[in-house]
Amino acid sequence: DENPIAETLNALWVLREKKNYYDAAKNVASIMRSYFAKDGQEDTKKYANDYTNKYRYAITVFICSVYKRPKLYYGFNAICYLSNGNTRTFINLCRTIISDALFYEKKKFIDTGMVSKEVQSRAIHNYSQAEFDEICSIIKYGNYIRNFVMNIGNIFSTFHKDRKMRYPETNQFVFSEVNLYPQDREIIEVAKSWAMIIKKEKAQRVTASIDKKADIYHINKIFYPIFNISYRTRGGVNPTFSREEIHGMLTSMNYSPISLDNESKPENKHQKTRNNGRDDGQLSLFDIGGVWNDE
């Protein structure tokens, strides 16, 4: 039977091997068969972790972005994560889902008390977009905050489509508030007060490979469906932005300080390629990310 997730994972393993690709392909095919046959071959434990957890969501996002297949947010976990612990958001998401269920599949909903994943996904996406559209209603600095959320979302949308899966489920970032330009610092404070961006309570490691702690931020998770960003946090790579880059993302709709190349991770300033223009494919509303439909 076809298994696009396993096939893509196999290709990823081959690409990361430094030996002969043909031998690597035969080896990973053997490991895959052993994993599904449950015969205990060496390396099946690592393959199992990559297949069921580490890369499953990232691979699903990538495959769906290539084939323009819908990705779905649905279920209690998705609603809880997207709500960011905000009771109002949680209730509004549930209300929107029920309202859509009564409109699109009333008989099924009344008979079974259940809502299909497609209807849940549509409702969550629409609510996410409506919340994003409301950012400009913030009287002070609303347009700047909208620019910032848009640019950050575009960056992580690009990360999620990386063909080598170097940034699986990356959705957090780092910057120094004290080093910002005075007005930019004020804008960030307004954005935080409205929970448009959220600061982690405790400083965390910047990246898995750098033993340095810093303040970690993310945009409100209710916006994640717009940009096809996983609500899970892997924390392997948290790109760091300078005050000039933060200023650019606040003041321009089309500012992208990071451009992915094929060789390096953007873990520090020396590994970033600047690009003040946005890749035309960065903002893609082709559908919804989160709890993926693996069918």
Where in this protein do the model-derived segments appear?
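Repeat-unit-sized solenoid/scaffold elements
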Residues: 1-29, 108-118, 180-189, 218-241
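P-loop NTPase catalytic cores that bind/hydrolyze ATP
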Residues: 1-15, 69-104, 182-197
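Long, low-complexity, polar/charged, intrinsically disordered or flexibly structured peripheral segments
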Residues: 1-67
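Winged-helix-like regulatory helical subdomains adjacent to P-loop NTPase cores
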Residues: 21-24, 28-32, 36, 71-73, ...
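Short, flexible coil/linker elements and helix-boundary hinge sites characteristic
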Residues: 36-37, 68, 112-113, 228, ...
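Composition- and surface-driven signal marking solvent-exposed, interaction-prone regions
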Residues: 77, 92-96, 103-111, 202-213
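Long, compositionally biased intrinsically disordered regions
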Residues: 166-295
